[in-house]
Each structure stands twice: as C-alpha cells, then as structure tokens.
C-alpha cells in the first residue's frame, strides 16, 4: 500500500507549481539602483552599533554554571519560585522578540540596518540558549520538571498581562513608527525589572555565572533598544510619528504593567529582595522609561532619579579587570549606553 506523500508548505507548493510550468529565473530590474548590488554605508549610527555588537559577541559555551547549581539550594522556597518564574518569562519573551525581528528588517533597504539585524538575531539565539541552561540549573537539571513548570506558568496572569497588552497594542497599531515604540517598550521596559532582580543575587554572592550572563544580556538589550530608538528617529521618513500623547500613554501603561509584574511575584520571605530593593527596582523601571524617552527626543514622564551607586546594575558601568578565575570577561569593548 502506497503511503501518502507529505504535504508541502504553501511556499514550497507555489514553487513546485511554478517549476512545473516554467523555468525559474532571477528577475533583475530594468533600471536597478547600483547600490543594491554592493555595500555602502548609509546609516553610520546603526553601523556603529553593529560594530559594537560584533566586538562583544559571546556564546553560551563560554559560561560554566557548575557553581550556580550549588547555590540553588541556598535560595529560600519563595526566592527559588520567583527566579524560576522570571526565567520562564524571559525565555518566552526573548523568543518572541526573535520571531518579530524578521518582520522589522523586511521594512528596510539600507544594508546597515539589515546587517545590524543579522547581528541582533544571532545574539538573541545565544540569549535563548543561556536561558535554557539557567532554567535547568534552577530545576536541578530535571528537564521534565522544567517542562511541566513552564507549561503551567506561561499563561500566568502576570505574564498574560504583558502579552495581552502587547497583542492589543499591535492590533490597534496605526503606523510603522508605533511598532518601533512597542519594540522599545518590550526590550527596554518589559525586561528591566527582571534584569534588576537577577542582579540582586550578586549582592549575596549567589549564582555568580547567572549574574555574569545577566550583565551580558542586559548590555546586549541596551544596544538593541538604542538601535530601535535610532531607527525611530532617523530612518522612518515618510511615516507619520504617533502624537506625543499616544507615546506617553504607551510608556505609562508599560511601566505600570512592569511594576505590577514584579510586585505580584516578589517573594515575601527573601533576604535578597527587601522592600527597599523592590522600591529601587521600581524606580529603575521609571528611570529607564525616562531615559528611553530622551533617546527619542521627548521629555521625561516620571522625572525619576538615577539609581544610586549601591544598585546592583550599577556594577555594569564600572571598569572590570578579568581575573584568572573568571570564566568569561564581561567587559564591553566600546561605549555602551545603558540605563545608568
């Protein structure tokens, strides 16, 4: 008995139908723009960010999490639950960003922007793989337990609040510039509290390599949000920008959701995340929003003060010297504009 032939995807079906009736040919425009066929720099600011990304490439294989596995047992039950939740969210959100990058890059012809997005997609893959490793560390390498937890957590109300808000804003999105505002909010606001809460592990000398990877990922995301701001400012000619009230409204809503996210999940039995630490994280989220508004040439919304020197993410801004025992240097080549 003959088995049924596997179904083809729509794209492959179209290709098969076309090849059955005519030879495939590359269509070259009659009057092509010569710059289409060679590289020329058109976006120096984006090209700088691409170069910075290349200088600071890193891989998940450079980090060794053995010591972190021992530290998991030092977390309280509430702390362990909290950090499992954060990394379940970050992993899912990071994959969502990766899926959307292809759609954004297709809007542009400038090769600097296209080349930059290639670099961003590559490092987002590394982030996804690192989050996979950290999740397994938090579940004592029990993959089945991790799978069951993620399946039961991904629709948690705190996560759904972010996803539902984003889906609603995308549906009502009236312009390409507004899509970039949403990307700025995803990477610049919806990750901010999680990055800060993870950094507080450092103050207790816990999960050192997880904190190290958090430094690297936080810096990468700072580059990504800066790129979105540059594109919003300089490369969306012909597209009407959303009115200021609309932009401020989106920022205000995103900040409220992010602060609600961290408040609803913060452990009550924690010596890592004290009430003062949570207040500092909330201020950091507001400060991040004001900084991003400044990058798109708008006045601050919250006038939040910058975090003080004791804030754990402040350590990202200090000069670092790689010591013999450090698995991977977290010193960034070049200047990185971050939230501090």
Curated annotation (Swiss-Prot):
User: SUPFAM superfamilies of this UniProt entry?
Assistant: Ferritin-like
- Membrane topology of the entry: Single-pass membrane protein
Q: Which reaction does it catalyse?
A: a 2'-deoxyribonucleoside 5'-diphosphate + [thioredoxin]-disulfide + H2O = a ribonucleoside 5'-diphosphate + [thioredoxin]-dithiol
GO BP field: deoxyribonucleotide biosynthetic process; DNA replication; release from viral latency
EC number, as in UniProt: 1.17.4.1
Entry GO MF terms: metal ion binding; ribonucleoside-diphosphate reductase activity, thioredoxin disulfide as acceptor
- Which keywords does this chain's UniProt record carry? DNA replication, Host membrane, Iron, Membrane, Metal-binding, Oxidoreductase, Transmembrane, Transmembrane helix, Viral latency, Viral reactivation from latency
- Subcellular localization(s) per the UniProt record: Host membrane
Q: Which domain of life is it from?
A: Viruses
Main localisation: host cell
Main enzyme class: oxidoreductase
Cofactor list: Fe cation
What quaternary arrangement does the UniProt entry report? Answer: Heterotetramer composed of a homodimer of the large subunit (R1) and a homodimer of the small subunit (R2). Larger multisubunit protein complex are also active, composed of (R1)n(R2)n.
Q: What is this protein called?
A: Ribonucleoside-diphosphate reductase small subunit
């Amino acid at each position: 008995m003959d088995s049924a032939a596997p179904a083809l995807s729509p794209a492959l079906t179209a290709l098969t139908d076309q090849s059955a009736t005519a030879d495939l040919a590359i269509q070259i425009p009659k009057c092509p723009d010569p710059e289409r066929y060679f590289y020329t720099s058109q976006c120096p600011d984006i090209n700088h960010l691409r170069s910075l990304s290349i200088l600071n490439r890193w891989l998940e294989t450079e980090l060794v999490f053995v010591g972190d596995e021992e530290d998991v047992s030092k977390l309280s039950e509430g702390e362990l639950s909290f950090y499992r939740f954060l990394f379940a969210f970050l992993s899912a959100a990071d994959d969502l960003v990766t899926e959307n990058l292809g759609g954004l890059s297709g809007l542009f012809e400038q090769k600097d922007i296209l080349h930059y997005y290639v670099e961003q997609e590559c490092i987002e893959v590394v982030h996804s793989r690192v989050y996979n490793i950290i999740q397994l560390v938090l579940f004592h390498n029990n993959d089945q337990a991790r799978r069951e937890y993620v399946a039961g957590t991904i629709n948690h109300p705190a996560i759904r609040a972010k996803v539902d808000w984003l889906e609603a804003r995308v549906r009502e999105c009236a312009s390409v510039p507004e899509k970039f505002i949403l990307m700025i909010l995803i990477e610049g606001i919806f990750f901010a509290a999680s990055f800060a809460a993870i950094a507080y592990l450092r103050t207790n000398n816990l999960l050192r390599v997880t904190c190290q990877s958090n430094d690297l990922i936080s810096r990468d995301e700072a580059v990504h949000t800066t790129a979105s701001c540059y594109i919003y400012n300089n490369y969306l000619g012909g597209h009407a920008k959303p009115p200021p009230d609309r932009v401020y409204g989106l920022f205000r809503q995103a900040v409220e959701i992010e602060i609600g996210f961290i408040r609803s999940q913060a452990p009550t039995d924690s010596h890592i995340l004290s009430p003062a630490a949570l207040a500092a994280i909330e201020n950091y989220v507001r400060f991040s929003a004001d900084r991003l508004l400044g990058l798109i040439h708008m006045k601050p919304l919250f006038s939040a003060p910058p975090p003080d020197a004791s804030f754990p993410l402040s350590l990202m801004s200090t000069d670092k010297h790689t010591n013999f025992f450090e698995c991977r240097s977290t010193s960034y080549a070049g200047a990185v504009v971050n939230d501090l």
